[in-house]
Structures are given as structure tokens and as C-alpha cells.
């Protein structure tokens, strides 16, 4: 397993990189009728996460064109999504391989099979303290099975509110979104921020550009070291404005090998490159385990892949980049990201171009923008 230590890069280094980036334009799987996969015995080799000394680890399981993320801290465990129905046995086996006997929290990010499908198998095997989802009902069999196995534990599927905070050992988990009601299921994805010491992680499910924009404008603290790249790297997610607010050092993409959707899309890889974010991909590297000591983090992967394979986009494509601007919602002035007079984060709104800011009724700051 590849293993190396990642030192945190300064916020301003990442902001300077993304400030010159291009503003890019912004596969749903139908639920299967298959039965819940019985919990198997542990037989497959698992990533050697158990050998890491870090008391915090985040595992991106290799569930193909789907998502499943295990978070562990101080002997407590949280599962965010369970992949497809057919991934259920693998997810159960992986959790067994980590020595897990109980899950503190189980989250279904949203009601699509490639996120909820494997959770029924998980809940049929592991007791959970709380189970969360943005909805309590959906028309698909895989979601009904998820509810059924939750209820068999004497639990109800809970719909959490934005601002809810959970403790997972000494880590803090905060629900940031969705901040509005959406007709598009992907945009209903539960967005979680996980903080451990000074390291931070953002889980976004399949959240797309509209919900991303609303989340940015809500004033939520989105800056994070590690971003779970939304919707498997689709160009419908990871909008320029959103990535400018997160400024991750690392973006993790969970997608299937040679998947029919073409994920991750070139547009997404390009903007991640522009932001200076290292890209990790389950389709090329298998399961990915990030460990943190509260200051820095280590990254371990099942398989090795070169940077050119992980992000094959052309660095020269950034040459036609447009400037990003930060507006002050109170003064109605907009600034360069390097301006010394930036407003407090809660009063910021992001614009991907000068014209966009002007069209919104904002005027340029005379200190940082010379006309």
C-alpha cells in the first residue's frame, strides 16, 4: 500500500492558485430489485488501515461507481453511504476487517442506489446508534430495505437539521447542508464537515452546482483539507465558486473503472488542478485511507498510480483563466482574494468574473482593483 505524509499547505497558497483559475461550466443509477446480500465472513484482503497509528482515519472504500466512506476516531465509527446493493457484502467485509462491532452513526447521503444500496446489508449485520437520511421514504426497493433494516434494530431513520453537531471520539462532525429544498435528488445530499484537530474533511455526496452555490452563500465554513469530490467527479458538481470556498489540498473521487458516465470529467479534473488540489481516485488506486494526527495526515492506497494518470488534464489549459472576486454583502463592493480589506467570511459572496459581480449590483474596491 502506498504510504506518505502530507504536510498542510497554507490557505493563501491555495487561494492564490485558484484565483487565477478558469470559471468552468457547471448518471443516475436506478435501484435494483436484488435481495440484501447476506453478511459474509472476512475473506478478502483489506487495506492495511489497522496498522496505522493515527487515532483518526477516513476510508474511501473501493465500491466502483458508487460511494462509501468509513470514518473512525478513538474507537468510534461512522459510515457515510454504502455503495450499490451489490457492494453490500464487500462493505460488510471491509468493516469486519477493521474490527468494527458497532456503528455510532450511519448516514445515507441521498436516496440513490449507488449511495443507499449497500446500507441494508450493513444494518443487517452491525448495530447502529443512529441512522440518518435527508428523507424517510422513497419509491425504490433499495431504500425500503434500508428503512426496513433500520427499523429491525428498533431505530427510525432520522432527518437531521443543518447545524447539528455530533461527536465521534475527539472528532467533530457538523451538518452543513442541504440549506434549501430541492427537487433534484442529488442536491438533497447531506453535507458533512469533519474536524479532527486542525485537519478538516468535507463529505458532499452527489451535491451539484445549484446546492453548492446556495451552500457557499449560506456562509458555512467550507474550507477543508480533504474534499470528497461530488457526484463521482461529474462536471455537474465541483463548481468553480464552490471549490474556491473549499480550497482543498486533496480531492478524492469515488468512481468505477471505465464507467459509462465518463467520470471523472475533464472539466472537474481541470478545476482541481487549477486549485492545486492533489487528486486521488478509487478507480485507479482502490481503497484510499487518510490518517490524521490532528496536524498533518498520511495517505495510503491499495494500488499505485502516477500523477499523470490521476489527473491527465493539461496544465497549460489554465492559461486562459478568469479572475475570481469576493463580494461584501453589506457594502456591496467586490474585492480580489488578496485584498487586505476582505469582509468577514459570513459576509462574503463569491463571483467568478468581474461582469458577474457588476451585474449583481456590486462595485469594485478602489484599494485592490485599479480601473
For every predicted segment, state its role.
Residues 24, 332, 358-361:
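Residue-level signal for mature regions of secreted extracellular proteins and peptides
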Residues 9-34:
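Sec-dependent N-terminal signal peptides of Gram-positive bacterial secreted proteins and lipoproteins
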Residues 328-344:
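Short aromatic-glycine-(Arg/Gly/Cys) micro-motifs in beta-strand/loop hairpins
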